[in-house]
Amino acid sequence: MADQTPTHYAKKETIVVTRILDAPVERVWRSWTDPDLVKKWWGPKYYSSPFCSVDLHEGGKYIFCMRAPKEQGGQDMYTSGVYTKIVPMERLEFTQGMSDKEGNRIDPASIGLPPDFPKELHTVIVFKKIKHDMTELIITESEWTPGQMYIYSIVGMHQCIDKLAEDLKS
């Protein structure tokens, strides 16, 4: 019998998360572009972020790390990508994929993720000023393969933004 493992997925999904944050655009922008601030909220609930680097210019690279809680093994997972478009205080566009700690891309399956986990995502973050001191944040991730990891990623993204919103209160 031939191998039935899918190697190509015709249909791709897009995740869109919109949130109103009680902070001015400038502060929300810094929370996405200042490594020390990213480390305060990156990763889903109970995860921490011990490392982050940001080279904020078009063509610049970023590396974000999220650490699982001890109860889930405590492993570090790295995501890296390249900024493809930057409009300060308005828009960030970048690629995104699993990597090693130096930011070199790795096959997601090599760290235990399912074989259909995307090797590269395209992310757009829009920052819209509403009122004097509030921001509408719109995050769009495209190139997701339908499946369980897609669902987990939606939940994880909401948890990240919950952590960001809480951090912005301080």
PLM-predicted stretches and their roles:
Residues 19, 51-54, 79-85, 120-129:
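Hydrophobic/aromatic beta-strand elements that line small-molecule binding cavities or substrate pockets
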